[in-house]
């Protein structure tokens, strides 16, 4: 699987809230850092628990990809998220190692949600 396919599969798993698929695409020493919320988890199990909590608190969370940039060992994905009747924009930066996501850095405007676009 190339980097584009990896991230497309990963994003699809987020929209399906499929923790098993998400976890299978993480490196064992994955770091998940949401810079906007100042939340950080490290290691496969801690990151899985963190994402499970996100899904628990946002059962209607959905992402749409606005653009996806890929290289040999990284990806950057611009997205719009929607949950609880509001939308916000952000970008994820993914260093890739040995075909797995080694890190997910999230930068978003979640502190400035807006009404959904129709």
Task: Label every model-predicted segment.
Residues 2, 33, 48-118:
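A beta-strand edge to alpha-helix "cap/lid" segment located at domain peripheries
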Residues 5-13:
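Solvent-exposed, amphipathic alpha-helical segments
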Residues 16-31:
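Short, well-ordered alpha-helical segments enriched in acidic and aromatic residues
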Residues 31-41:
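A short gly/proline-enriched turn/hairpin at secondary-structure junctions
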Residues 39-49:
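Short beta-edge strand/loop motif at the mouth of beta-sheet-based domains
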